[in-house]
Amino acid sequence: MEEPVTVYSFEVWDQQQGAYIAQRLKSPAARIERIAKARIIVGTAEEVDAAALDPHGRYNPLP
């Protein structure tokens, strides 16, 4: 079992819609910070096993 990591739901600005759009997958804060115009949705923190992240550092909260 790998170390736990905290992942968050987040939203990304969609220029065409003129609004932030929530993303289905969760990510660690460090990954979200690298995405242009993305912001963490407060209160969505979840601790998961690092092995549950995909190769891009994303976590699918739905089985």
Place the predicted regions along the sequence by residue:
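A short beta-strand micro-motif
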Residues: T6-D14
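Acidic surface patches and DE-rich sequence motifs
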Residues: D14-Q15, D54
